[in-house]
Amino acid sequence: MKNDLLANRHIGISKKDEEQMLRKIGVSSLDELIDKTIPANIRLKEPLALPEAMTEYEFGQHIAALAAKNKLYTTYIGMGWYNTVTPAVIQRNVFENPVWYTSYTPYQTEVSQGRLEALLNFQTAVCDLTGMPLANCSLLDEATAAAEAVTMMYALRPRDMQKSGANVVFVDESVFPQTLAVVTTRAIPQGIQIRTGKYGETELTPDTFACIVQYPNAGGNIEDYRAFVEKAHAAGCKVAVAADILSLALLTPPGEWGADIVFGTTQRLGTPMFYGGPSAGYFATR
């Protein structure tokens, strides 16, 4: 079979090709092949009950009528995923504007000024809301940002901790479960141990080099972590805070009470859930 023509590559085999293939496997037709390979008891005996053909417009109306039968309920999923209000100007000029994700490569500065400006605005907003001096241009989501925080804090252990082999991260039990799952998965191959518990009751042992807390936590509680952060720093531990970035418009930014890393998801800032994505994670540090 020749593949040098687009029609051959994309339309499929010719009748002659089909006959050669059938002869090779010892059958005379596709019907005989199906009879020999698909059990009769699972095959449909009667023709498909299809309605009359519709135009594209009629089909659109039909599907809309079917969709209108769905019952819409308020989503209480939480845990880092929330319904949002997306400003119309953002929806039209960003989400529905393919220029943002189709034109050129983002690494050519001379043709990506708009994208570079958007990234600078993103980083500036993250720094302003978290109270931190540095922010990157986003990560995949909150859970992977947490894993990056652990890797970073592990690499930044003081020399005495490195010599003693300190390899424990304390994760508060009110951290989102998906965050804990991803952090645990990423920690295992690095030889990092994960310990969970209540932040206000845990004792930070000498082998603990970092802590992670949620703000507000998975139960929606707004905890005052100041004393815990001071305790962790006194023990030589760094503290990463998983923060709801929208709440930071009202709450005291973690950077103002001593957090070393602040991370989370920016889905809260107006990105629709899109059946589970996309959601850019943010990451800020000092």
Segments predicted by a language model, with ranges:
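Residue-level preference for well-ordered alpha-helical positions
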Residues: L22-R23, I34-D35, C127, A187, ...
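Conserved PLP-enzyme active-site core in the AAT-like
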Residues: G114, T144-R286
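Gly-rich Lys/Arg/Thr-decorated short loops/hinges at beta-loop-alpha junctions or inter-strand turns
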Residues: N97-T109, C127-M132, K163-A166, I194, ...
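N-terminal entrance/gating region of PLP-dependent enzymes' catalytic architecture
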Residues: I38-N121, C127
